[in-house]
Amino acid sequence: MTILFLTMVISYLSCMKATPMKEVSIRGQGSLAYPGLRTQGNLETLSGPNDATRGLTSLADTFEHVIEELLDERQVIQPSKENKDADLYSSRVMLSSQVPLEPPLLFLLEEYKNYLDAANMSMRVRRHSDPARRGELSVCDSTSEWVTAAEKKTAVDMSGATVTVLEKVPVPKGQLKQYFYETKCSTKGYAKEGCRGIDKRYWNSQCRTTQSYVRALTTDNKKRVGWRFIRIDTSCVCTLTIKRGR
């Protein structure tokens, strides 16, 4: 599904007339221990003529270029001299020497696509489609944040066994910390009363955190270290049960 999503985004962006960036510096390092982790694209320099429309088209070209780099499994990008530790991405998992400042790339791409859709609307349609103006609210409130392996400590793998999540991953230049981008139901506000918009006369509702599998460096109860798929919190959904006797 991830490859399909990236392919659709590339097709969408390729239809736009984008002005190439004058200079794009990308830093990163391929991971020998875990091929599934890809390098982070870092846009260091943006320069060019002062055109009101150039920023949007240049950004589209940049995203297309970054996606192509992420999809190229054979390419190994050498780290720059200024950054000895490369930040490595894999969906909701990241290896970095410091706490990530932004959500994973796929989340940013989704927000960017929504921005492009809004930019193509007229001002009147844009105001009408604004969720805040229509009074739209999510059924369940959720929170997302980066957590470290030190905070997770243990997790459940695909075989149902409990494994220990390693806090640091060895790399040629030292060690990097494992970070996980988790999404869970908010414990504040309306969530305690059930889901929004549900008729309580007929339905019992509850906001529940669901999990998905991501790959991480772990050790099992026999002290065997390896990359395994583990479960982390990835979404907040509304579950319904019909009230009896109605």
UniProtKB/Swiss-Prot annotation:
It is found in: Secreted. Residues 19-127 form a propeptide. PROSITE patterns: NGF_1, NGF_2. InterPro entries: Brain-der_neurotrophic_factor, Cystine-knot_cytokine, Nerve_growth_factor-like, Nerve_growth_factor-rel, Nerve_growth_factor_CS. Pfam families: NGF. The keyword Disulfide bond applies. Disulfide bonds join 140-207, 185-236, 195-238. Keywords: Cleavage on pair of basic residues, Disulfide bond, Glycoprotein, Growth factor, Secreted, Signal. The gene is BDNF. GO terms for biological process: cell surface receptor protein tyrosine kinase signaling pathway; modulation of chemical synaptic transmission; negative regulation of neuron apoptotic process; nerve development; nerve growth factor signaling pathway; neuron projection morphogenesis. Residues 1-18 form the signal peptide. Glycans are attached at residue 120. This is Neurotrophic factor BDNF precursor form. SUPFAM superfamilies: Cystine-knot cytokines (SSF57501).
